[in-house]
């Protein structure tokens, strides 16, 4: 599976976890893969379950970099993109931050409103600088 497709499928799973807070990660994953046939590989599983298990740490990091934004104002789509990208930046050092940010921008352009990608870009650049130190 190409990384771009894997990242998009991980985003779909994370988006569902943002929207379906009453379901466990395992339930979301099972429904998406077995019922709807969402393709996955090791990357998809690692990012989805890793972002779910580390959601508190990821959210704390994101909140430090929101600069004038309240979490409640962020669309579920942008929140899922930020969680995915934050997980990559924070826990997957083998993926360059620039690649993560560019792919997150592409997801925002495809799935969210026209202004979302610049917001996503700004937040992720700030987070990447923190983790580059």
Regions found by a protein language model. Give the residues of each.
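N-terminal interaction/assembly modules
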Residues: 1-117, 121-133
